[in-house]
Amino acid sequence: MICESIDLYAYFQWERGGAKRGLLYSYRHAATLEMAPRLRPAILIFPGGGYEFVSSREWESVALCYFQEGFDAFVLEYDVAPIGQYPTLIEQAGMAMLYLRREARHLSLREDRIA
């Protein structure tokens, strides 16, 4: 398994402003001798609820469930209230999805199966 963290603000060269988070964590399948490399579907996970909290209970366990089903899973650690204000929360979600679409080939993702 390939586990990485990507600072989306650094990747897009955006000023962070008051944002504290905006980190994307990957749980990707590694190419092995037993399995031929292939493009995989990807899922973007937003753990938590109502932009009020990020839930550790909905983080790795959810990512690993999708991973076991053949997905490469990505978890967004996003800013929440009161620090995270509109539009910061939506911008971080947009940055995560744009990153996955831009880097799909490099990450061996199926461009038509990113959700």
Language model features with spans:
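Short beta-strand element of the alpha/beta-hydrolase
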Residues: 39-50
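Serine-hydrolase catalytic-loop signature spanning alpha/beta hydrolases and amidase-signature enzymes
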Residues: 50-54, 73, 99
